[in-house]
């Protein structure tokens, strides 16, 4: 079973191929940095312009055609509003054209799944800007990764307090939110916080594809019409409209 995973929820977009739970190929594109000259995905400014070349690049790397895929997996958020819409629209288009099933995966869950060699609590933090993070706590025991808190957007201070409430004195935290607020996390836990880059999967797309595998194996998938992004908070445009009305 070959799954194509796609993530554009963060500044680093990624696509990956996972076969029977094992990573076959992956490609990453960080829009905050210039693409390397030898990269098949050239710097084009935004996810809308690079997502299709990114998918084609990972298919080429894995020597896989769309017709050979068993399904598509996509991160549904939280994350960049525009990025989430682009990924979902792209995946739905491919699914309709090729008759492929689709599974949506929480970006925070995929982020936590990038850590395998750790038993216990994992704090998944994605940078939501404005001194806020998208945040959830997970617990890994063996091969099982279980959410133990709701997914939410909150201040970094609130996330730190939640980790403390979970009884963690040296929490393992992962994600660009953990990196962005590393000094605060280090101070809060006396330098004992473990900032992890991920030891199992280098990209969110690979983790997304791997997490979807069980559902595909059970012949389960999401309804395309009802599959929508998980934003967790209102957009700037919605906030401005609400302020104008009030």
Please name every model-derived segment.
Residues 73-102:
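DPxDG-like acidic metal-binding loop motif
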Residues 1-76:
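N-terminal beta-alpha supersecondary unit
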Residues 194-246:
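Acyltransferase
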Residues 60-68, 95-105, 220:
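Phosphate-handling active-site elements
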Residues 60, 64, 143, 165, ...:
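Generic secondary-structure signature for well-ordered alpha-helical cores
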Residues 58-62, 97, 115, 208-216:
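Stable alpha-helical structural segments in soluble proteins, enriched in small hydrophobic residues
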Residues 22, 30-36, 40-43, 101-202, ...:
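Surface "functional belts" at beta-alpha junctions
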């Amino acid at each position: 079973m070959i799954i194509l995973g796609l993530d554009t929820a963060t500044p680093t977009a990624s696509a990956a191929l996972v076969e029977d739970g094992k990573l076959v190929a992956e490609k990453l594109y960080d829009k905050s940095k210039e693409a390397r000259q030898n990269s098949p995905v050239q710097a084009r400014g935004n996810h809308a312009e690079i997502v299709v070349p990114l998918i084609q690049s990972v298919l080429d790397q894995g020597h896989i055609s769309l017709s050979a895929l068993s399904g598509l997996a996509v991160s549904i958020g939280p994350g960049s509003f525009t990025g989430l819409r682009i990924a979902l629209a792209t995946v739905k288009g491919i699914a309709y054209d090729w008759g492929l099933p689709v599974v949506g995966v929480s970006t925070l869950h995929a982020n936590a799944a990038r850590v395998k060699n750790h038993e216990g609590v994992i704090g998944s933090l994605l940078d939501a800007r404005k001194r806020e993070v998208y945040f959830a706590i997970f617990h890994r025991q063996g091969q099982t990764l279980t959410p133990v808190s709701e997914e939410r957007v909150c201040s970094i201070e609130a996330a730190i307090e939640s980790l403390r409430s979970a009884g963690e004195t040296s929490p393992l935290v992962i994600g660009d939110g953990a990196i962005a607020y590393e000094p605060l996390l280090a101070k809060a836990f006396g330098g004992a916080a473990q900032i992890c880059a991920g030891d199992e999967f280098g990209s969110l797309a690979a983790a997304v594809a791997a997490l979807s595998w069980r559902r595909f194996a059970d012949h389960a998938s999401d309804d395309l019409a009802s599959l929508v992004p998980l934003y967790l908070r209102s957009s700037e445009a919605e906030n401005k409209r609400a302020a104008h009305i009030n």
